[in-house]
Amino acid sequence: MSIKSLLTTVEPEDLQDVKNFCKVDGDLEDQEITGMMLSARRDIIGQVGDRIDDFFDDNWNFKYAVWLKTYHSYNNRDTSSNAMTFEIQDTYNSTINAMKDDYRYRVWLNDKAKNYDGEERNED
């Protein structure tokens, strides 16, 4: 799925996966959860990068980060509450950092392949 598609549409199976993760039954809040998923995707892609269109396809870390961000947004959506709210888990940040590392490596490989002219290059 292209990055453009990830930022504009949510497939029914992706919505169901998030609802299962958030332990949400029924379809009463599907529109809100879909919006939270799109927002999570935009945030994650913005942090990681958008030069490699297929990077997020079948990427478990991306899927898991979307689940975590959506779960956090869903459970902390009432901003007028006196109840204690929590920051997003370290697991989310670790997952984002792992994706950033993978992404930078893929960009480096792609750039190296484009610039390869048969001679050794100094990568420093």
Listing of model-derived features with the role each one plays in the protein:
Residues 1-124:
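Divalent metal-cofactor coordination and adjacent catalytic microenvironments
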